[in-house]
């Protein structure tokens, strides 16, 4: 993230703590309140950039922080207990609308409120997850933007086998309590035998599970498919380090993994949903029922390849695969 974006984010966060109580009490005088619950660490630069873009988009739509809108932030990291507590806290601020990111955070929010409008981002398969009735007409007080349908897991396996053609074993790193993660596993299990690949399930719920699962799998070698979750995103450095230590080719679901040293990734750009999410928040603040706003699918997926990591694994990336890539990290 640029230094300008970093300063902007610090200013946006820090300014909230300095507003006088008279300003904070102005909801009845036209100041609208947006609660933001992110399933990541507060100092994560990826999500700082996301929020800077989100806030700027709302400002472009006429919402100026401290004048007619206020933002309340909660960052949960990977802890489900903290997600529950932060969900309760944000509801206690009486927001007009909530921006919630990741499946686990949205699950926590829906256990606390079904009446406050929610716009979700960074969610996989919201229908299977039980968040919405269907994509065109989500119903209730919730809508948003989702990342992946289960079928994309077949692409993860295919790209991994192209960049590491000798693979015969693959572990699917996933949080078993997240329904789409299990669906990803089932798709991979169905496709792998046709490619001569055996599939292992690497279930994780915390950092210790990641260390254990990848160390155990790494003893015999193979490849990794790392499914999306707050846990895998928050602990991406640990996962990437373990993959490097055990020489495990791995594919990830977002480009920021490859930017952090991951071998290959296929998924949406991490900033893609920020401006559309701001548009939905704007519409809800102006009176639109969230249940009437369709859940939006990704506009495109990006393939990102890290050639430096490939070289460290003694892998030669085919030119045909490099030509398909949206970004190649030298």
Language-model-derived ranges and their functions:
Residues 1-330:
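Short hydrophobic alpha-helices and adjacent helix-cap/hinge residues
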């Amino acid at each position: 993230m640029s230094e300008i974006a970093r300063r902007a984010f610090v200013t946006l966060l820090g300014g909230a703590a300095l507003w006088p109580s008279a300003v904070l009490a102005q909801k009845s005088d036209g100041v609208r309140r947006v609660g933001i619950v992110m399933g990541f660490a507060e100092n994560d630069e990826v999500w700082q950039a996301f929020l800077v873009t989100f806030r700027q988009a709302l400002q472009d739509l006429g919402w100026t922080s401290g004048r007619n809108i206020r933002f309340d932030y909660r960052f949960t990291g990977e802890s489900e207990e903290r997600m529950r507590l932060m969900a309760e806290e944000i509801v206690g601020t009486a927001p007009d609308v909530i921006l919630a990111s990741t499946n686990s955070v949205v699950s926590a929010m829906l256990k606390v409120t079904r009446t406050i409008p929610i716009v979700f981002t960074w969610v996989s398969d919201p229908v299977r997850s039980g968040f919405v009735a269907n994509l065109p007409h989500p119903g209730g007080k919730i809508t948003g933007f989702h990342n992946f349908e289960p079928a994309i897991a077949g692409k993860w396996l295919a790209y991994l086998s192209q960049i590491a053609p000798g693979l015969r074993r693959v572990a699917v790193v996933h949080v078993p309590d997240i329904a789409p993660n299990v669906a990803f596993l089932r798709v991979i299990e169905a496709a792998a035998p046709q490619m001569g690949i055996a599939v292992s399930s690497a279930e994780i719920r915390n950092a210790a599970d990641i260390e254990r699962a990848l160390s155990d799998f790494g003893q015999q070698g193979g490849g990794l498919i790392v499914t999306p979750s707050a846990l895998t995103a928050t602990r991406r450095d640990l996962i990437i380090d373990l993959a490097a230590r055990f020489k495990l080719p791995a594919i990830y679901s977002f480009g920021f993994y490859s930017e952090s040293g991951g071998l290959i990734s296929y998924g949406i750009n991490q900033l893609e949903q920020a401006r559309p999410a701001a548009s939905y928040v704007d519409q809800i603040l102006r009176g639109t029922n969230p249940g009437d706003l369709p859940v939006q699918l990704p506009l495109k997926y990006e393939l990102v390849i890290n050639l430096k990591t490939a070289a460290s694994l003694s892998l030669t990336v085919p030119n045909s695969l490099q030509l398909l890539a949206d970004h190649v990290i030298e």
